[in-house]
Each structure stands twice: as structure tokens, then as C-alpha cells.
Regions:
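Secreted/periplasmic proteins that engage bacterial cell-wall peptidoglycan
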Residues: 1-115, 137-145
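Active-site or metal-binding loop neighborhoods of secreted/extracellular toxin and effector enzymes
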Residues: 116-164
Length: 164
């Protein structure tokens, strides 16, 4: 069942959430991802964005979004599949895979998961144009719902899920 997307409108959370910090470290330990950024009070990277308009505030401003880089695409795909299979348990609101190239496409426009479209693969949209803004980028963008009471609560949910 689809969940309401929690970050429209976005807001300034003032700092990185301890949940997101723990998640980034866990992604590093398990798959070697690197932290490319969590909290940043800025406008979205979107050609339509109007600087200073709250409608265009990046989800990174909430402290609940992160960009995690990788060097091995095969490992990134394993991580994508695992996260996608557990969007409900981990309360993942959104994931962007910028390097995904759809069959028959001439460019890697990416794909995105959003909780309001459904859980797991039901919530994935394959991009056919520059909608995500970073085609071919070697990182995942992940947004976690701000409903976790603590990093410890999130950690327990993570550890309850079998490793891939």
C-alpha cells in the first residue's frame, strides 16, 4: 500500500538526523558506500527551481536525505535491490539510482523509488529524460521517513532484516 510522501513541503531540520548518519555508516560497512552528503540547507538541483522559494527546498535540508557514492556498479545494484525489498521495514521514502540505463535507452537517465507509488518495485519509475538531474551519477540518493524515534530503533529494524 502506498505511503504518503513526507517531505513536501520540505523543511529545514537544522542538522543531519542521527538515523541518517547511522544509515550512511551501515551502507559503508556493508557495501563500501561513501558519504557524499546528508544535511544541506539549499535549493533543489532542478532547472525549474527558484532560489529562496520554500517549494524548492532540498530534502537534504531536513537532515533525513543522503547521497552515498560507490565505485562498483554490481555492488550498488545488490544494495538497491535490498533497499527496495525493504522499503516498508526501513521506512524509506525515496531512492534515486542515477546510473540506471533502461533497456533500449541511449543514456542512463536513472530510476527512482517513491513511497507514494507503492512499496518495493511498485514504487519505481524509470526515467526517460533528465528528470533526476544527474544522469549517470555513481551514487544513490536515499530519503528515510522522519518517523523513527531514534537511531537505535532504526538500527534494530535494519538488523532484523536478513543480509543479502
Amino acid at each position: 500500500m502506498p505511503r504518503k510522501y513526507p517531505y513536501y513541503p520540505s523543511f529545514n531540520g537544522g542538522k543531519a538526523s542521527p538515523v541518517t548518519v547511522w544509515f550512511v555508516k551501515a551502507m559503508n560497512r556493508r557495501w563500501g558506500f561513501t558519504n557524499m552528503g546528508i544535511y544541506s540547507n539549499r535549493t533543489m538541483k532542478n532547472p525549474k527551481a527558484i532560489e529562496g522559494d520554500p517549494k524548492w527546498l532540498s530534502v537534504h535540508a531536513t537532515g533525513w536525505a543522503c547521497d552515498i557514492g560507490y565505485t562498483d556498479r554490481k555492488v550498488a545494484l545488490i544494495a538497491w535491490d535490498w533497499l527496495l525489498a525493504h522499503t516498508k521495514e526501513l521506512r524509506i521514502a525515496e531512492i534515486h539510482d542515477y546510473a540506471y540505463k533502461a533497456p533500449g535507452a541511449t543514456k542512463a537517465w536513472g530510476r527512482s523509488y517513491r513511497c507514494s507509488r507503492g512499496e518495493g518495485v511498485k514504487g519505481v519509475k524509470v526515467q526517460t529524460g533528465p528528470a533526476l538531474g544527474s544522469p549517470g551519477g555513481k551514487w544513490l540518493h536515499v530519503e528515510i521517513e522522519n518517523t523513527w524515534a531514534s537511531a537505535e530503533e532504526f538500527q534494530a529494524a535494519w538488523k532484523a532484516i536478513p543480509k543479502p
